[in-house]
Each structure stands twice: as structure tokens, then as C-alpha cells.
């Protein structure tokens, strides 16, 4: 019992409303939204959290600032190195450009577009109004990680930087969910 409490402690300490074995709170992003890259052209379309089922996912919600991106970079690097199967796994990165340093939003969007070119199988959502942060009750200037099973149910959630042990836990969980 103590071990379970210790494992859950980081999740209990966060203010977010992401509950294990439930779906994320429903939210849509219509201003910008999901970034597409087809025929060397970028476009945006509306996105809704109801679209998160169908694949095992890591959803990374980050403020539109370098310091937030760096918080969970060790997990993202571990995911890249694992070469997870694109037909059954997807990383969904939601960038809150409403929480960017004033005057940097265009640079943030350019960085997201570069990432989409490099990782076309990944999903990038640009949230210009901070709708997802508000709906999920996430901390400002931060980074949250949510692991979803293929039904879209939360298996892990933390608002803040993951410890090395949590990175390992998430990677082991992803491999289990993909079996």
C-alpha cells in the first residue's frame, strides 16, 4: 500500500483535473488547432480532445516557451530513441502559445512547424487561447505529460517535470500498452 501511495504522490500533488482511468476533460481548439503539413504547405484545422482515442499516446501540454519545452525533454528523447510503432503510437504535443513570452509567438509557431516537418507522424496542436490549460487546470509556464491507452483513458498524468524514475515508468508503461 505504501508503494502505491508513493507512486501516486506526484499525481496527487498536482492541481490538474486529470484522473486515472478516465478520459481527459473535453475541450476543443478552433483558433489555430491541429497543424497539418501536406504538399510542403502548412495549414491548421480545428482539434478536439475526443480525437485522442485509437492509439496509445503521450500527450505533452507545454507553455510556448523554451523553459517549458525543456522540462520534459528527457521523456521526449527517450520516446524518439524507442522508435515506437507509428501505426499504434502517437505523440500529441499541445503548445499553449497564449503562455509565450510577449513577442515570441511567431518564433514558437516556426519551431512547431520545424518539428512537424521532422516528425510528420506526430500530432501538434497550437492553442492560441490557452483553452486546454484552462480545461485541464494546468499550471502556467509549465509542461504536463499524460499517457493515454488506445481507448483514450489516462494511465499516467503529471503536471511538471518528470523525474528520471518517472521517465522510466512511462517508457515501461508505453511498451506494456503497445503489446
Question: PLM ranges: what are they?
Answer:
Residues 1-6:
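Sec-dependent signal peptide recognition
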Residues 10-14:
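N-terminal signal peptide c-region/cleavage motif recognized by signal peptidases
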Residues 15-24:
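Cleaved targeting-peptide boundary
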Residues 27-56:
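A short beta-strand-turn-helix
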Residues 60-115:
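Structural microenvironment flanking redox-active thiols in thiol-disulfide oxidoreductases
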Residues 64-67, 97-101, 129-132, 154, ...:
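Solvent-exposed loop/turn segments at secondary-structure junctions
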Residues 90-94, 106-139:
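Short, internal strand/loop/helix patches
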Residues 141-179:
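Thiol-/selenol-based redox modules, centered on thioredoxin-like
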